[in-house]
Curated annotation (Swiss-Prot):
Biased composition (Basic residues): 41-54
Name this polypeptide is given: Coiled-coil domain-containing protein 179
Biased composition range(s): Basic and acidic residues: 18-28
Keyword terms of this UniProt record: Coiled coil
Segments for region (Disordered): 11-68
Gene name for this UniProt entry: CCDC179
Highest taxon of the lineage: Eukaryota
Coiled coil: 27-53
Amino acid sequence: MCLYCWDIEPSQVNPEGPRQHHPSEVTERQLANKRIQNMQHLKKEKRRLNKRFSRPSPIPEPGLLWSS
C-alpha cells in the first residue's frame, strides 16, 4: 500500500510504530522453553516426592522404647 502524501512525514502516517509480529512467530521458541522448564520442574518434584515417600520411617519395636 503506497500513500502519496507530500506534507506528511511517515511517522504521522503510521503513528503506532512498527507492526507487531504474529504471536506464533515470536513465541514459538518461548513456548518450547516453557515446556522444557515445566518438564524439568515435574522431574524435580517427582524425585523429591519419591525420596520422601519411598520408604516409610521404620516403626520401632515395642521392647526398644524407653519409658520415662
